[in-house]
Design a protein with these regions (language model features):
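Amphipathic, heptad-repeat alpha-helices with coiled-coil/zipper character that mediate oligomerization
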Residues: 62-65, 69
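Short runs of predominantly hydrophobic/aromatic residues within well-ordered alpha helices
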Residues: 41-48, 67, 101, 105
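Generic serine detector
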Residues: 8, 30, 69, 87-92
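Acidic, serine/proline-rich, intrinsically disordered low-complexity segments
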Residues: 1-62, 83, 113-130
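Alpha-helical oligomerization segments
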Residues: 65, 77-130
């Protein structure tokens, strides 16, 4: 049985804005701040791809950041080993069939709409205890 989507275009746009803002904030941080990604690495790479698709992240010279750079920066800050080929990770995630876990975008939208969690990505980031 197929699930019904209970979110609007506005909900999707809100999610994308939140993700872009999170990435802008995070890639400018230092790994010494002790932030750690606790979710799946493939989810983080998929998030990076969603953000890259918006074309809204720029480097210090004002040029659009490429996908590899976004992945490198976010993995550095969140203490995740950078995959050799991030694009293949995205391809693998999108090619999955018959999995119990739905697409990341849908999971995050469900958290926003049903659980009233405004920033689902932040649930998967923890700070190292000092």
């Amino acid at each position: 049985m197929k699930t019904t989507h209970l979110w609007s275009q506005e909900d999707e746009e809100q999610l994308i804005r939140k993700l872009v803002n999170n990435f802008c904030d995070l890639i400018n941080r230092s790994e010494e701040e002790g932030l750690y990604w606790t979710g799946l690495k493939c989810d983080l790479i998929e998030l990076a791809h969603i953000v890259w698709e918006t074309g809204q992240l720029t480097d210090q010279q004002g040029r659009l950041m490429d996908f590899q750079s976004i992945v490198w920066h976010i993995c550095r800050v969140l203490h995740v080993r950078v995959p050799c080929n991030p694009s293949s990770v995205v391809s693998s995630v999108r090619a999955r069939k018959n999995v119990r876990v739905g697409p990341l975008r849908e999971r995050y939208l469900q958290l926003i709409v049903d659980a009233k969690i405004q920033d689902p990505m932040r649930l998967e980031i923890r700070r190292r205890r000092r």
